[in-house]
Amino acid sequence: RGLRLVMDMVVNHTSDEHPWFLASRSSRNSPYRDYYYWRPGKGDNPPNNWSSFFTPCAWKYDTITKEWYLHCFGENQPDLNWENPAVREEIYRMINWWLDRGVDGIRIDVVSLFAKNIDFPNATLRTSNYDGYVFPIEHIAFQPKLPGYLRELNARCLAGKDRVSIGEATFVTTGNANTIVGEDMLDMVFQFELMELGNGEEKWEPHPYDIAAFKKTVCAWQRALDWNALFWGNHDQPRAVSRFQCETPELRARCAKMLAGALYCLRGTPFLYQGEELGMTNYPFSHESELRDIESIAFLHYEQQHDNAAYAWNGIRSKGRDNARTPMQWNVEPHAGFTCGTPWIPVNPNYPQLNAEQQARDPASVLAFYRRLLALRQSSEALRDGSFLPLHAPCDEVFAYERR
């Protein structure tokens, strides 16, 4: 069918059960010690005031070696030390192992965080979100050594090969994207400015969507990069139709088609997340037993401790990562036809009314629209390779552009 395979590479961190980490924590003299960031504490406290994406503190104390290790995500996800050439060699060897077996490209997880400020100063740029801890964006994102790491990765793994590289770039902006995208670095980046338009000061805080900000953001990225990665959702984002509060039966299909047409006719490569082509919606979470995402669970526990459970549940239902991780809705059979066993996470209860089998028979369905839209992109030279020109609309609520 002409399919190609792009493989996800998570090389910012490993599991705390990985052999490297087990060896690293076995002794301060282990040859794997510097595969991770280990630092002594300040008395009984961690090395600095950094928070992580998922926990109040970005450091975890190890009772074996009496030091702290850095984890920018969950405490069971210790960060790899990209300063160590041996770590980079291990990563390049692994990537080449897959490329040599025919993988057509790589999607690199949180690529913007590979380089850290290894002086580990206290974070001050943001306000404290968790009991005095501060997220250290100024010390972990887009650090000076990052472009050099990506050039080295390109030279060791990708140069001279017909392979694509896409970086998931947390905190990327139109101002810094070109420091990691280019002929000798990455081909594309996933940027999240469109995803974050509905956020307040932090992810969980609601904020009304602004069509003017939407148009400004789209046009800025179309100008900033010659080629963009176009997407409405992934495994970390809520479902697109729910994000824009269009999940009612009357609006869902129309909204899903509108979002697809608005984004996937832009200049760039469309990336579709499973279920998007059906207009799948968020899950109506109401109990902790339904949650699997460590970020959502940590957020719920923190807010419960501060008597803000209602705020937490509103945030989880609207923005929690589990919304995108419910099983694909294939048909009306039990578990939406996804499995004859028990799925790891519950199936959205709306699957009898929203599934692939029904939409495949309906020429007016969201699925049918996606098929026509992608066929149009394939057949139209203007949509495949043409330029982007924003058009002035007679009213603010209209987003219009021209491809030629």
What are these regions (language model features)?
Residues 1-404:
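Active-site and adjacent substrate-binding regions of carbohydrate-active enzymes
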